[in-house]
């Protein structure tokens, strides 16, 4: 090996342990992009870049998308597809999301003891898998109506890693918390391997139910998703009026989403329906008993402190007392101070999981900058705005859903609501039509986007988390498991936009539950 030529060594180092065919594919992408951009069409080069980036996300288990996606984004800036200034504009425009990832996810890490305590009790008390799935989906939906979906999914990931670690350490006979739970070589028997596979399938289904739950709840309120806030501000709605305007679509979708959760579990469809293995249940029960017996007064105080911080977290986020990232930072400060975590090394561990994804999301904003500079969505937006008022609602809903499933739904929602607001300000559509379009944009952005991990930041965070490889949750598997929800939520949402939105909005208006906001036909919509 010492005599290896330099070019071979470079190829071996390039993207590390990724397969050779994957390395060659990325190399071909980097070769083709400038040729297409300079000699064929910048527009189609932009679309090819979007497809390539989606490919890197799809191959996340072969190679973390930050490196190949980052190389593609860097090249896009170098050849002029976008500029560093535009990328920085996108990054600063989404600074709340980045701060959330840096501080909120780390804050949740310091509440792990309480979360594991609560969810272990929940898991061991509820024996019906359908009921447990319903509890996870419903709890995620409720929390996502008030908290950010990323925060909710970070909680569920933290709990799932805790459960997985407890059984893996038992099965591999590694007692300490420092044991490598990603290494299956130490599993002591074939029975443990089989049980672990079952447990992985069980955790996958719970996580997907929770992930979809964040979308079901997040679409309902103006604080549920970042783009909701942008849409609410543009339409002049407060918390209650936003909920009421959305309810003709979101309430039927929520009911059908919950029914889908029960049906896929009951009939064991699309990878759902796997029960918690008895061996794992016994290990978790033993762990729970052991922890209860060993719990010292200090441990009990830690749980109490974390519970109080949890209440602060929900209240602060629900009433938007500060930006999400700052609330996360306050959680870190209080949890570490009152639980006695003061060593730099111990605090640093909390940031390990979120930082790679934070970097990846920044790369994602570079791709969004290309979409803006090359105006990749402009033809679609122009086409929709030129159609008749009667067909605008369904077209806005469908095109929002399509674009949100391949791009950032915050970006798509922002672009569409700005275009709709401009059309209203220029007198092309009425105020009532603008409000209906705002509902179609919000629901279209949030509901069909569960189809792929690209559309929902919470799904992308789950896919690229340290948990995904542990439970064998790949891009393809996520798409398949999300499929029943995608079909039901998209179709029910579409039918509601088409048939119930207008009459129910009129009903709410006539009964003075909602009223037209005082929007002017001129000026910016800041």
From Swiss-Prot:
GO CC annotation terms, alphabetical: plasma membrane
Membrane topology: Multi-pass membrane protein
GO MF entries: sodium:proton antiporter activity
Location in the cell: Cell inner membrane
Key word Signal present: no
Family matches, as Pfam families: NhaB (PF06450)
InterPro entries named among the record's database cross-references: Na+/H+_antiporter_NhaB (IPR004671)
Reactions it catalyzes: 2 Na(+)(in) + 3 H(+)(out) = 2 Na(+)(out) + 3 H(+)(in)
Keyword Nucleotide-binding among UniProt keywords: no
Alphabetic keyword roster: Antiport, Cell inner membrane, Cell membrane, Ion transport, Membrane, Sodium, Sodium transport, Transmembrane, Transmembrane helix, Transport
Highest rank taxon of the organism: Bacteria
Similarity comment: family membership: Belongs to the NhaB Na(+)/H(+) (TC 2.A.34) antiporter family.
Name of the protein this chain belongs to: Na(+)/H(+) antiporter NhaB
């Amino acid at each position: 090996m010492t005599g290896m030529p330099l070019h071979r060594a470079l190829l071996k180092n390039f993207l590390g342990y990724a397969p050779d065919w994957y390395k060659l594919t990325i190399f071909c992408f980097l070769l083709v992009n400038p040729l297409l951009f300079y000699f064929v069409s910048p527009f189609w080069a932009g679309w090819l870049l979007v497809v390539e980036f989606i490919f890197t996300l799809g191959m996340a288990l072969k190679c973390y998308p930050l490196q190949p996606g980052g190389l593609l984004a860097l090249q896009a800036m170098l050849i002029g597809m976008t500029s560093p200034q535009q990328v920085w504009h996108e990054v600063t425009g989404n600074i709340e999301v980045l701060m959330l990832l840096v501080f909120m996810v780390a804050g949740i890490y310091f509440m792990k003891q309480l979360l594991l305590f609560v969810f272990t009790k929940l898991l061991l008390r509820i024996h019906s898998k359908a009921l447990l799935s319903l509890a996870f989906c419903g709890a995620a939906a409720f929390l996502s109506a008030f908290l950010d979906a990323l925060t909710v999914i970070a909680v569920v990931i933290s709990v799932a890693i805790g459960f997985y670690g407890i059984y893996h350490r038992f099965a591999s006979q590694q007692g300490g918390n420092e044991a490598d739970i990603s290494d299956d070589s130490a599993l002591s028997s074939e029975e443990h391997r089989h049980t672990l596979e079952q447990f992985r399938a069980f955790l996958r289904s719970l996580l997907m139910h929770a992930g979809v739950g964040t979308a079901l709840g997040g679409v309902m309120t103006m604080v549920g998703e970042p783009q909701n806030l942008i849409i609410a501000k543009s339409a002049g709605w407060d918390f209650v009026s936003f909920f009421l305007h959305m309810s003709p679509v979101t309430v039927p979708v929520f009911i059908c989403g919950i029914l889908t959760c029960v049906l896929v579990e009951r009939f064991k469809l699309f990878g759902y329906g796997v029960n918690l293995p008895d061996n794992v249940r016994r290990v978790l029960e033993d762990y729970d008993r052991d922890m209860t017996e060993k719990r010292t007064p200090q441990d009990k105080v830690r749980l109490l402190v974390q519970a109080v911080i949890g209440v602060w977290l929900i209240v602060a986020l629900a009433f938007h007392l500060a930006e999400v990232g700052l609330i996360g930072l306050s959680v870190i400060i209080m949890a570490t101070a009152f639980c006695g975590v003061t060593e730099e090394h111990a605090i640093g561990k909390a940031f390990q999981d979120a930082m790679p994804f934070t970097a990846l999301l920044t790369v994602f904003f570079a791709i969004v900058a290309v979409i803006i500079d090359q105006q990749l969505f402009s033809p679609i937006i122009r086409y929709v705005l030129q159609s008749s008022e009667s067909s605008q609602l369904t077209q806005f809903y469908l095109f929002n859903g399509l674009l949100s499933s391949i791009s950032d739904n915050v970006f798509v929602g922002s672009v569409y609501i700005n275009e709709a607001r401009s059309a209203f300000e220029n007198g092309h559509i009425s105020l009532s039509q603008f409000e209906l379009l705002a509902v179609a944009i919000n629901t279209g952005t949030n509901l069909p986007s569960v189809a792929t991990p690209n559309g929902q930041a919470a799904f992308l965070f789950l896919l690229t988390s340290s948990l995904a490889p542990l439970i064998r949750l790949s891009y393809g598997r996520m798409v398949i498991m999300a499929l029943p929800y995608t079909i039901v939520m998209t179709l029910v949402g579409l039918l509601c936009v088409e048939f119930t939105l207008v009459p129910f909005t009129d009903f709410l208006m006539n009964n003075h539950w909602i009223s037209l906001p005082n929007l002017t036909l001129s000026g910016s919509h800041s």
